């Protein structure tokens, strides 16, 4: 944890190194993730994370939130796209998503909304619908 300071840059307090649960904010929703290596200021309570730990923590929190909401995980979204033989860009055109949306869903850096999740499930569960939409959208 080289990048975690020993002195808090906010208040000057001592930063304690800990391994334990942390709350991670995902769009205003707090997700508790256990066993996280981090630093916490003994005076003001500010938390500090190594950048690599923060990235893993964020992805883990997204996966946990997807599971809690009953959303498809990134691995299933990728499997669906690949089963249709589409690139990420072509899949985005098919479903009307913005650039780089699918890669973010697939690597669990963001979660899809319920409407998008429902569309993904329809494409997965009804191949005829997927084929018809592909013919109309992608030519």
Regions found by a protein language model. Give the residues of each.
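Extended interfacial segments that mediate partner engagement and assembly in macromolecular machines
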Residues: 51-115
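A generic hydrophobic-segment detector
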Residues: 97-139
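N-terminal flexible/basic segments that precede or flank functional cores
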Residues: 2-71, 122, 126-139
């Amino acid at each position: 944890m080289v990048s975690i300071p020993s002195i808090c840059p906010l208040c000057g307090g001592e930063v304690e190194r800990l391994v334990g649960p942390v709350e991670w904010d995902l769009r205003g929703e707090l997700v508790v993730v256990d066993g996280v290596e981090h630093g916490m200021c003994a005076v003001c309570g500010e938390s500090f994370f190594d950048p690599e730990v923060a990235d893993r923590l964020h992805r883990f929190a997204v996966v946990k939130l997807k599971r809690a909401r009953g959303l498809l995980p990134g691995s299933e979204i990728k499997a669906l796209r690949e089963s249709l033989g589409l690139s990420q860009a072509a899949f985005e055109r098919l479903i009307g998503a913005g650039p780089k949306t699918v890669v973010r869903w697939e690597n669990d850096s963001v979660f899809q909304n319920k409407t998008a999740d429902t569309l993904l499930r329809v494409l997965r569960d009804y191949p005829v619908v997927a084929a018809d939409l592909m013919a109309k959208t992608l030519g």
